[in-house]
Amino acid sequence: MTDIFTTSKRSFVMLKIHSKETKPEVLVRKFLFFQGFRYRKNDKRYVGKPDIVLSKYKTVVFIHGCFWYGHSCNKGHIPKSNTDFWLEKITKNCERDIKNETELEKIGFKVIVVWECELKNKAICRERLNRLVREIKDAV
């Protein structure tokens, strides 16, 4: 399928996509706050600027978009156009995250990843968020 935008228009559109304050991030943060957790968001003091840092529990949470991290769900596929570029980009994202997670674990943090697709369906979302709370509490 061809792109409906020109190359310059596509670049402009892609520049407007931000990596913070996504719907999945806001959903997870609101849930955690409602559950009584206090946290910092996108804390630059830690490698990889985790989406959520729960210092009291020595836990960081990353909320990953399935497309950007090549998740095995149906949203994690490589686009048919410019395949080499996207394959390289997504591979680098994954490699960088493995390195960052290793560094965070070395300094004593538990790393939890929540996938975007786990938050789409209400029943699955509820289960995932409840499991997240258990994972955080088990980290202590």
Swiss-Prot record:
EC number: 3.1.-.-
Enzyme class: hydrolase
Keywords on record: DNA damage, DNA repair, Endonuclease, Hydrolase, Nuclease
Domain of life of the native organism: Bacteria
GO annotation (BP), single: mismatch repair
Pfam families (alphabetical): Vsr
GO molecular function: endonuclease activity
Function, in words: May nick NmeAIP sequences that contain T/G mispairs resulting from m5C-deamination. If unrepaired, these mismatches can lead to C-to-T transition mutations. The very short patch (VSP) repair process counteracts the mutagenic process by repairing the mismatches in favor of the G-containing strand. This enzyme is an endonuclease that nicks double-stranded DNA within the sequence CCGG (C-methylation site unknown) next to the thymidine residue that is mismatched to 2'-deoxyguanosine. The incision is mismatch-dependent and strand-specific.
Family: Belongs to the Vsr family.
Protein name as it appears in the record: Type II nicking enzyme V.NmeAIP
Protein species of origin: Neisseria meningitidis serogroup A / serotype 4A (strain DSM 15465 / Z2491)
